[in-house]
């Protein structure tokens, strides 16, 4: 099945795609600035990604008319900004029950958890960059929460859901 070519569409039509590219780039930048290693698999997508290896994923969840926080609660004028809801997630391998049925040692569980809390803190550091449209020029603010999911297939995922204006 051919992939649709978007190389010739208008810049306006690429607004959300450009935000997705920018969020992925800024996420990598913040982690690199703080010497926090990231998985080599890095991409953005729509919806929930499959978790089959260590990866950094930016996922498109929703877009709506209005600034961050005014999600479809009140009627909005067509001239209002648009806001996107994205999930940024990092899945990392964690210690699991061995083939012998024994749980990992407590220190190994804690060691596996350290990356998750570092990732959550880096997500909070990332917010400053996500609210900048141009260097030194701030946007309309962001709304964000970070959490950690239960393990799935030997991987644990730290995620941040963020709502930000689409410039």
Task: State each model region's role.
Residues 1-78:
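Small/polar-rich, solvent-exposed N-terminal microdomains that initiate assembly or binding
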Residues 2-11, 15-22, 32-33, 77-83, ...:
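Extracellular/virion structural assembly segments
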Residues 31-36, 54, 109-165:
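Acidic-leaning, charged glycine-interspersed low-complexity segments
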Residues 41, 46, 98-101, 105, ...:
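A generic structural signal for ordered alpha-helices
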Residues 50, 69, 104, 139-144:
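Polar low-complexity intrinsically disordered regions enriched in Ser/Thr and small residues
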Residues 60-65, 90-92, 145, 164-166:
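Surface-exposed beta-strand edges and flanking loops
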Residues 80-96, 153-167:
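Oligomerization/assembly interface segments of phage tail-like spikes and tubes
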């Amino acid at each position: 099945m051919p992939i649709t070519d978007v190389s010739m569409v208008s810049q306006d039509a690429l607004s959300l795609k450009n935000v997705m590219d920018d969020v992925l780039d800024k996420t990598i930048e913040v982690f690199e600035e703080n010497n926090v290693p990231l998985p080599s698999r890095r991409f953005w997508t729509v919806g929930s990604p499959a978790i089959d290896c260590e990866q950094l994923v930016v996922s498109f969840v929703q877009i709506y008319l209005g600034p961050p926080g005014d999600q479809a609660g009140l009627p909005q004028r067509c001239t209002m900004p648009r806001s996107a809801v994205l999930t940024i997630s990092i899945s990392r391998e964690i210690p699991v029950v061995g083939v012998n049925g024994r749980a990992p040692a407590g220190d190994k569980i804690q060691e596996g958890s350290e990356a998750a809390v570092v990732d959550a803190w880096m997500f909070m550091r990332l917010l400053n960059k996500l609210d900048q449209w141009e260097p030194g020029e701030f946007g309309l603010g962001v709304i964000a929460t970070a959490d950690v999911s239960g393990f799935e297939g030997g991987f644990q995922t730290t995620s941040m859901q963020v709502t930000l204006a689409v410039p």
